[in-house]
Amino acid sequence: MRSAFLSKLQTHAPVAQPQVISSGLAKEAGDLPQEQEVDAEDQLSADAQDGVRKIQATTQVWSKGHLIFAYVMIWVITFVDTMQQGMSNSLLPYVTSSFRLHSLTASTMIMSNIIGGLIKLPLAKVLDIWGRPQGFLIMVGALTIGLVMMAACNNVKTYAAAQVFYWVGYNGMSYTISIFIADTSALKNRALMFAFVSSPYIATVWVGGPLATVFLNGPGFRWGYGAFAIITPAITCPLYAVFAWNYKKAKDAGLLPEKTHSRTFTQSLKHYFFEFDIIGIILLASGLALFLLPFSLYSYQKDQWRSSLVISMIIVGGLLLIAFALYEKYRAPVCFIPFELLFDRTVLGACILAASLFVSFYIWDSYFSSFLQIVNDLSITQASYIVNIYSIGACFWSIIVGILVRWSGRFKWLALYFGVPLTILGVGLMITFRQPDVNIGYIIMCQIFIAFAGGTCVITEQMAVMAATSHQYVAVVLAVESMFANIGGAIGQTVAAAIWTGVFPQRLAEYLPDEAKANATLIYGDLTVQKSYPVGSLERIAINRAYGDGQKYMLIGGTAILAVGLGATMMWRDIKVKDFKQVKGLVV
């Protein structure tokens, strides 16, 4: 689901003035405003930023038909994007293998995950200051540029750069849609609406593998990306149009009086430079990238860990992270991360859970498709079905979770007593079952466990951060939660790549028969070469054993980190969302 995990997965009636603490966070469940108290105040929030006021005005003037149309278009956009995601996931090992660098499958995603996660906090400011439609349009543009670059790439460096553009755009677009849902749904219905929007995964999961096969066996992977570079802008335009039309309608109705600013162009540049904390973003993104990338790239250096490049990247990355912390505390006029929101234990706990889930997920998932194709001798299509059990199960189960949240009015119990424990069970069992000569049915069973658990955790962690704050801060806390998830994903991919590059080539060289040892480097770097050896041959058995050893260490690490997530879930307040109304206007 969020890209599904992830991606990971991912309101306006008249309201009474919410009771909030100084940071804008809601108090304990007993202090939340009651639904009966919020009957007749249609005016816009006086202290809200321009983007929030714009969406409040928009939802007061649009019709029920426009609201339904917007949700239908969001579903269609999600359908197309998830279909493209499924295809891309199946193509990725072949794209990197085409450059003889299959082991960089995880590395190509590390930088994109870091930047894709960090971009959401500045994007939250864009949405709150300038408006939702503007942010949506910018992100669609970035996504399209990424697809065009992937279609035209001739080396793994260009492909990695394309991944950055793509994931910035995709994560940003998904995030904007999440904010739209938060703007247009009552809190008690929000989990169900998030689940509805993610439901296309249930259908598109069956299409990704066959679609990748069609392009690989036909015009090539480049046309796979090129086709969606045309389709994506076409299907996103109607949603932007309905946003823009109703904003104009609200403006014409006088709900949004013009604001004049006396700043010059230079003053505006300076204002937004500090408002978006550009220095902080550069320090954090550069520091994380330089610190994490060497763990997956060291095996390509002659001296490996003793390489001056690897050592200098780790040291400089660490120093930049320290510089970021010092700058944010002592020098930044506007902090990149809203630390005052993180003081709330529910927000902090949800963010830590998101990070730990993504660390775990990307540790065990990064080479899962390759494992299935090599060790279990599955086709791309068959492997995609098993990999995507998570997407199917999580999206289906999230609908059940949404109904349970609406019925019970609470969400903590679902994560604490079901979601996180079942995730630990599913990942832990795979330590034994994801090995050569083990019946694939056991792997499928574990995937189902993790899928139902994931559908619970993703929805409840998002509900936790939204329920703990007022409408004014929803965009920010969702951005913070997503940033933790994406950085967790980057860390998980780093750990996966480090384990893979440290274990697989060493065990491969150890297990290969003497006559094949000269080809170890070629086998290590190319999935198609690995598949070329017949099943049952000494070379294929050696490759399978090396895969099994690498997977075992990945799964041990993925299971261990989940203990942090269980503790984080215990931190949440047990907020009753039935009694809490955040939004204005016509909502679901």
UniProtKB/Swiss-Prot annotation:
Which residue spans adopt a coiled-coil conformation according to this UniProt entry? none
Description of what induces expression: Expression is induced during iron deprivation.
Q: How does it sit in the membrane?
A: Multi-pass membrane protein
Q: Which UniProt keywords apply?
A: Glycoprotein, Membrane, Transmembrane, Transmembrane helix, Transport
TM segments? 60-80, 104-124, 133-153, 161-181, 191-211, 225-245, 278-298, 307-327, 348-368, 385-405, 413-433, 440-460, 473-495, 552-572
Predominantly, its location class is membrane
> What is one GO cellular-component annotation here?
plasma membrane
* Residues the record marks as carrying a glycan: 519
Gene3D superfamilies tied to this protein = MFS general substrate transporter like domains
What's one GO MF term for it? Answer: transmembrane transporter activity
Cellular localisation? Membrane
Purpose:
Major facilitator transporter involved in siderophore transport.
- Similarity-based family: Belongs to the major facilitator superfamily.
Designated name of the protein: MFS siderochrome iron transporter 1
Instruction: Provide the species name.
Output: Ajellomyces capsulatus (Darling's disease fungus)
Q: Which gene encodes it?
A: MFS2
